[in-house]
Amino acid sequence: MDRFSASHRKRRPVEFSEPERRRQFGWLRHNATGLQIVAEDLRSGRLWPNERTRMMNDGTIVSSPDAPGPGLSAAIEVAHLTKFYKTTLAVDDVSFRITRGSTTGLLGGNGAGKTTTIAMIMGLVLPSSGRIEVLGCSMPRQSAEVLGRMNFESPYVDMPMRLTVRQNLTIFGRLYGVENLTERIEKLAADLDLGEFLDRANGKLSAGQKTRVALAKALINQPELLLLDEPTASLDPDTADWIRRHLQTYRRQNGATILLASHNMLEVERLCDRVIIMKRGRIEDDDSPDKIMARYNRATLEEVFLDVARGRLQEGMQ
């Protein structure tokens, strides 16, 4: 018998029509409107009908028993996290715990499950099963209580092109309820060398400038937890190194926790205290970069990554 008791299985599941299911559990874009919808649904109880629920493969929602929460020393804890997209298994029974103040990299190829894992941690994608705790709160049930303490950055998420940098940052700052917002925007502009671009339309910025604006958006609320998806993708080496150094400075000065998904092995080696290697939705290894390279007798994470991709881990360990 699985962990869901017979009494829970006998309960009548909460059922939604297909259009309603798509509305409630559709893949929300990470923008102001999407986050407001999540927060409003969570406050009203519309998003999660019960305190603990599970989505079955056919989309029906059934109750599951409460699980004990972790201590507050963890920034993120996921247990047996699984995600199906119809019949495709995107994330397969993933468990890990990330301590506060650390930088952890999710390393893996396309389709490894990195972005889906981050989206579930944020509460933007509903897990099929498993438990997620973020900053001491159960996700996504308690998302409204924790969203203001975390943020997300990705070069693949565009902000309105016609709005100026200042207008975009103001929208996100108001969404997060940032106090003294004008001063906060000016400080970020100074820290990230954006002063001369504040009143320029986002659509007129270069790729590197847009990345700095995206980072400013991610730091607008001084998050305790920063989630990054390919933060330096398509950037020249100098700009990418500048972004990495600023992230390191922010973590040191604020005691923040960073979780990043990346294909960039050098970036992970330089930024991360710990690496979680994923393949086909499962965790292949989880340790510090140095220990992983030593264990598989490889000089770089890139060599380890290629071994994982080509199924040669056992050969590397011999």
Name these PLM-found stretches.
Residues Q222:
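Conserved catalytic motifs of ABC-family nucleotide-binding domains
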Residues A201-L205:
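Conserved ABC ATPase signature
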Residues L226-E230:
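Catalytic Walker B motif of ABC-type/P-loop ATPase nucleotide-binding domains
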Residues D241-Q253:
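Helical segment within the ABC ATPase nucleotide-binding domain
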Residues D286-D287:
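ABC ATPase "signature
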Residues T170, R174-F197:
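Conserved ABC ATPase "signature" region
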